[in-house]
């Protein structure tokens, strides 16, 4: 049972902080970067809006996440470095596109691969087991392991970016995945990691309030890259922490 009073109070405070961050950024979105984050393309197939909508969802999310990590370190002396570096790095790649800076897709992909490869190697992020014997054998090779983890990240990130476009679709999908991961970790008493998952769920729910059913804010590429990378990391760690659950389950979940 998750009943730590201090952490519950902290999450309640974080919920309020997150809501006001989204509210303030949404209200002043026209002044942020001279309105470059406003979506005024009404002719694209997935456009259901007829007025300028802010693509500041990613910006509000990364600010909320950074505040959570900082405050968590302040109160509990624990900082999630890999989450901070990967999330911020992938956010920046998408944020440049949100600012309408023309970067060729191949350069975006290369940037993502470099950030992820460096993070995977530096933080020793690995997939400890899969339910395929030959893959377990191959993953004993350090270079193959890095490539395989990199592929998993890119699969989730680009999948998130692909389904982003309809109000609430990406947020609801990511919310469902992370809620299932949270339940799994709660049942196995992995409360420290559960704490981080709940913080991400709070950010997703807050964004959903501004995105569905009538959008006042979009994720943008920065938001889909950010939460795609976070969700990939969440799934990898949950797979590693819960050996009794088949790795095929997590593949199907995604």
Locate predicted features.
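Short, Lys/Arg-rich N-terminal segment immediately upstream of the first membrane anchor
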Residues: 1-8, 50-51, 136-139
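Short capping/connector residues at structural and topological boundaries
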Residues: 53, 58, 135, 222-224
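Intramembrane alpha-helical segments
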Residues: 59-188, 202-212
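Cytosolic, membrane-interface loops and tails of multi-pass inner-membrane proteins
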Residues: 27-54
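Short clusters of hydrophobic/aromatic residues that line enzyme substrate/ligand-binding pockets
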Residues: 48, 130, 217
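Hydrophobic/aromatic positions within or immediately flanking transmembrane alpha-helices
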Residues: 54, 145-148, 197, 218
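Alpha-helical transmembrane segments
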Residues: 2-31, 38, 61-89, 170-254
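A short N-terminal beta->alpha junction/helix N-cap motif
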Residues: 16, 20, 50-51, 55
């Amino acid at each position: 049972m998750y009943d730590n009073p201090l952490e519950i109070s902290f999450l309640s405070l974080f919920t309020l902080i997150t809501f006001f961050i989204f509210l303030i950024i949404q209200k002043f979105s026209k002044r942020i970067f001279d309105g470059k984050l406003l979506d005024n393309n009404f002719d694209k197939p997935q456009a259901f809006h007829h007025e300028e909508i802010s693509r500041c969802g990613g910006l509000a999310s990364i600010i909320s996440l950074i505040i959570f990590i900082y405050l968590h370190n302040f109160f509990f002396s624990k900082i999630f470095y890999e989450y901070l570096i990967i999330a911020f790095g992938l956010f920046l790649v998408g944020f440049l596109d949100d600012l309408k800076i023309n970067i060729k897709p191949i350069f975006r992909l290369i940037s993502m691969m470099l950030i992820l490869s460096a993070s995977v190697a530096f933080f020793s992020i690995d997939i400890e087991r899969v339910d395929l014997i030959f893959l377990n054998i191959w993953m004993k090779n350090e270079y193959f392991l890095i490539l395989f983890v990199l592929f998993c990240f890119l699969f989730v990130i680009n999948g998130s970016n692909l389904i982003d476009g309809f109000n609430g679709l990406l947020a609801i999908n990511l919310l469902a995945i992370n809620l299932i991961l949270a339940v799994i970790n709660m049942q196995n008493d992995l409360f420290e990691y559960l704490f981080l998952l709940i913080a991400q769920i709070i950010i997703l729910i807050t964004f959903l309030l501004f995105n569905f059913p009538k959008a006042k804010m979009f994720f943008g590429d920065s938001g889909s890259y950010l939460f795609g990378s976070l969700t990939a990391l969440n799934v990898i760690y949950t797979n590693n922490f819960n050996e009794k659950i088949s790795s095929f389950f997590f593949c199907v979940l995604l």
